[in-house]
Amino acid sequence: MKSLHIKICGLTSLVDARAAVAAGADAIGLVFYAPSPRAVSVAQARAIALGIGPFTVATGLFVDADPGFVQSVLAEVPLQLLQFHGSESRAYCESFQRPYMKAIRMRPELDVVAAMAEYPSASAILLDAYRPGVPGGTGETFDWGRVPQHTSRPLVLAGGLAPENVANAISATRVYGVDVSGGVESAPGVKDHEKIHRFITCALQASAQLNSKGD
């Protein structure tokens, strides 16, 4: 198993973003979806992305956004990765000519492998819990046994992760990365720095244990 990658999503302040980076986050997520309590303005996002340093991946999360809006964000905010969390097509995702991660919501009847195959150009696939009408950030987990075990695609696990369960999640799924938002907050959009530290510590310990077993 390769080294685990950790993304802290839904950041709304530079203070919280820097705390995530200091704790060991590989990536931070900026939400450009107005209905979300974690949504940021372009100005907020620009300040955060410019303030986290060059070695942390600034990720922009969009949900079925108008292409013109995405382009306007890209013109102002130095994003290294786009995350599409709606029903975007492969052609849409590829149209921005940027690395992208496609979120797949784990509906009960979903053929996960087939859904992943629809986005062969994605840099990673994010698997998130499903709740009708809610594109993400539900705070709910899903059956980790549904995560494909034999794939060359980088898989990122999301959905209800927290310091208390991330180690079990990693042990069960052996994913490329984990993505957390609500599980490290004191209120929607307000990160708890101690929870971030615990989450990352627990995640890295679980990953190290798997690596020590030669998996």
From Swiss-Prot:
Catalytic activity: N-(5-phospho-beta-D-ribosyl)anthranilate = 1-(2-carboxyphenylamino)-1-deoxy-D-ribulose 5-phosphate
Cited Pfam families: PRAI
Class in the EC hierarchy, top level: isomerase
InterPro entries: Aldolase_TIM, PRAI_dom, RibuloseP-bd_barrel, TrpF_fam
UniProt entry keywords in alphabetical sequence: Amino-acid biosynthesis, Aromatic amino acid biosynthesis, Isomerase, Tryptophan biosynthesis
Database matches in SUPFAM superfamilies: Ribulose-phoshate binding barrel (SSF51366)
Any one Gene Ontology BP term: L-tryptophan biosynthetic process
CDD domains documented for this protein: PRAI
Keyword rRNA processing tagged: no
The keyword Cell inner membrane appears for this protein: no
Pathway the protein takes part in: Amino-acid biosynthesis; L-tryptophan biosynthesis; L-tryptophan from chorismate: step 3/5
EC number of this enzyme: 5.3.1.24
Listed GO MF terms: phosphoribosylanthranilate isomerase activity
Similarity remark: Belongs to the TrpF family.
Record protein name field: N-(5'-phosphoribosyl)anthranilate isomerase
Underlying gene: trpF
